Each structure stands twice: as structure tokens, then as C-alpha cells.
Amino acid sequence: MKAGKLSESILKRSVLRQLHNSAVRAPGVGIDFGAVDASAGKQIVTAEACRAFDTFPEAGVYAALNNLVCSGAKPLGITMTLLLPTSASENDLRAWISAVSRVSEKEQIPVLGGHT
């Protein structure tokens, strides 16, 4: 893929279409925020960022979730920034997004957005 942001068609086809999402405001083109329903009692919002350089994309998601859970927080959503080398193909992108989507669905934590 070429350097820079993904084209809108690749974003829709290889990222947004794959995400299992139960967020109140799901990710979309030009949407720079996400929303979850946190009305079940008093809520404190926390955030965690974890870099993943592996060929095992789930590891980065689980590392970030682990940091939140160990601090006593209940994760309500996932945001991600995906930086791929120019040698990556659209199939590589799809594989990463598919892995993140599997974690999202398994852990019942929606993907709220991110940057690609």
C-alpha cells in the first residue's frame, strides 16, 4: 500500500466492514470519536495505549485491556492507531482488523474508532 492515510474505499472495505460493533456511535469515515452507554451507575473514564509490533495483533489489544483491568477499570471500548509499512498489502490490513474485531467480539468491547 502507498504511504499515508488509507483511501476511503479501502477504509470502508477492509476496516469498517469487518468490525463487530455495539457502540452507541460506531466508527466511520470522518468520525473522530466513539460513544458507549455508561449509564449503569457512576462511571470514570480511563484510557490506555499500548504499542504492538508483533505479527500477533491480538497481543496489543490484550496488553492494553490487561493494563486497564489490572488498574480496576472495566474496558468499555477500543480505539486504535494502525501504522503499517508501505510493504503491507490490503490483505495484511484486513488480517490486523480481523484480529482486532475477534478480540472486540469475544470480550464484548466495541471498537470506537481510530486512525489508519
Language-model segments: residues:
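Extreme N-terminal cap/leader segments of soluble proteins
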Residues: 1-54, 71, 80, 98-113
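A glycine-rich phosphate/pyrophosphate-binding beta-strand-loop-alpha-helix module
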Residues: 58-116
